[in-house]
Amino acid sequence: METQNKHEIVDSVEKLEALLARVREAEKIFATYSQEQVDKIFKAAAIAANKARIPLAKMAVEETGMGVVEDKIIKNHYAAEYIYNAYKNTKTCGVIEEDSAFGMKKVAEPIGVVAAVIPTTNPTSTAIFKTLICLKTRNGIIISPHPRAKKSTIEAAKIVLEAAVKAGAPEGIIGWIDVPSLDMTNLLMQEADIILATGGPGMVKAAYSSGKPALGVGPGNTPAIIDDTADIVLAVNSIIHSKTFDNGMICASEQSCIVHEKIYKKVKDEFLYRGCYFLKKDELDKVRKTIIINGALNAKIVGQPAYKIAALAGVTIPETTKVLIGEVESVDISEEFAHEKLSPVLAMYKAKDFEDALSKAEHLIACLLYTSPSPRDRSVSR
C-alpha cells in the first residue's frame, strides 16, 4: 500500500533546508485557517490514518522485525481514533478563553515548525499521533524517522498528508526526511521551533541540548509491587498482558516485579501456570549477557518473542513461552535485569515487607502497586 510521493527526496542537508523553508511557508498559510477549517482537516486525516491501521501495522512489523501485528493495529487505531475523539471539540484557533471580569483573553496561535523524532519501536502510531496534533494546532511538522523504520513511518505521514491536503490543508504542511541520519536529525532539531522527540536516552538528551524547546519521551523502567494484600491472579495477568503486548515495547510496561515474601511462591506459581518461564541459575547468566551489550540495551532482543531471546542466549524454551523471568536480588545498575528491556523479559525480586519493596522500587524509578485498599497506597504517594 504505497501512496504517491510528490515531494522532493530529502537526502542531504541542502534539501532538508529547502524542506524547512517549504513547510514554513505552508505553516504561514495554515495559521490563517479558521477553527472550522482546521477541524475538517483534523477529522479527514484521522479517518484516513485509522482506515490504514492494518496495512501500516503489517508494514511496520515487516520492516523492523519487531513487535506483533495485531497489537500495532491497536496502537494505530488508538493514535488515530482516540486522539481525534479526545481533541475534536478542543478550541485551537483564535480566542479560546475569555475572562470579562479581568478583561483577559487567551488566544491560541501555532508555534511554527515541529521537529518530530520517531522511534523504531512504535513508528506508525507515533507518526500518526504527532502529525494529527500538529494539524489540530495549525503547526507544520517535519518527521525524522528511525533508519530501521523509515518506510513505514513515511507511509503513515503520506497518508495523513494526502488526506489533510484533500480536506483543504496547505500543500507541504507535513514533511519528512527520506534518508535519515544523526546529522540530519540534529540539524532539524536546531532549525525547528519545537521538538517532539521519542526515542532512546541519547536522542532525547540531544533534543533537550539542541537549544530549542523540546518535549522528550525517553526510556521507562517501571517496577510493579505485588503486595501481600493484592489479588494475585489479577496482578500476574495484568503484568503478563503488559509484557506481551507488542512483545513488551511499550515504555510503560513493567520491567521488574517486586513481590512480598509471604506470597512469593503463589505469585511464582501463577506466572508458571500462565506460561511464563523462570530461568535457572546458569540460564540467568546467559540471558544477562544478552540483555545488555557494551553498556547498552541489545537491539536484537527488542520486540522479540521470549523464545527467540532465549535462543539468542543459548537457552532452549518452549515457543509458547510468554515471558522470560529472572529471579534477581540487586537493583543496582550493574544488574542487567534491573534495566529497561523493551521485550518480554521480566526481573522478579523478593521483598521482606512493604517498606523493603518500596525501597527497591525507588532505586529502579518509581512504582506501580497491586494492593487491596489499604494505608499503603498513601505511603506510596508520599
Language-model regions, residue ranges each:
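N-terminal Rossmann-like NAD(P)+-binding subdomain of aldehyde/semialdehyde dehydrogenases
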Residues: 1-105, 133, 273
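ALDH superfamily catalytic-core signature
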Residues: 10-13, 204-332, 359
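Short, well-ordered beta-strand elements within core beta-sheets of diverse protein domains
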Residues: 25-32, 115-116, 256-259, 342-352, ...
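Rossmann-like NAD(P) dinucleotide-binding subdomain of oxidoreductase/dehydrogenase enzymes
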Residues: 95-234
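Residue-level signal for inorganic ion chemistry
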Residues: 138, 195, 260, 309, ...
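Conserved glycine-rich beta-strand-loop-beta hairpin in the small C-terminal domain of fold type I
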Residues: 338-345, 365-369
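Hydrophobic alpha-helical bundle architecture
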Residues: 358, 362-372
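Single conserved hydrophobic/aromatic residue that forms the stacking wall/gate
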Residues: 370-381
